[in-house]
Amino acid sequence: MTSTNHANRHHDARATVIIGAAFLSLCAAWMSVLPLFAGPDEPANFIKSAAVVRGEMVGSPIDASATTSFWSTYVDIDSRFGTAQQVPWCFVGQPQVPACDKPLSTLTAVEESRTDMGRYPALGFLPAGLGTLVGPSDIGARAARLTAAL
């Protein structure tokens, strides 16, 4: 191997690391300014991720109704994770209202933790689930976003 080839490979690897770090930094910045649970299905994903990392792969089925679907299940985890479902209702269906910021710690669980992602394949939720090990809190939700991005 010539020294030129070695230098080119080193330069390519360095550029790849720099681009990857820049992209991860951009993702982290975006995740830190986007209000929690403002993304579509983010509460359901947060709850499913918390369940998967704690060994609850599917949960107990719920009959489909006006507010649930075939995919909905109750999961046997701390009910405080389920409070994430309450956050978006201050702006859903109200296009003129910006996303609100209700800290999870201020909400009271009204039912078992329910996720509309209950029957989705569990493996994809594992990375975000690692972030939920911080707990059912705003910091836990942000950690779940970050570990999902990795």
Where are these regions (language model features)?
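Helix-to-loop transition at the C-terminal end of transmembrane segments
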Residues: 29-43
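Selective detector of the "anchor" transmembrane alpha-helix that sits immediately C-terminal
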Residues: 140-150
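Conserved aromatic-histidine-acidic binding/catalytic patches
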Residues: 9, 13, 34-37, 115-119, ...
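Interfacial juxtamembrane loops and adjacent helix segments
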Residues: 56-142
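Start-transfer (signal-anchor) and selected internal transmembrane alpha helices
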Residues: 1-28
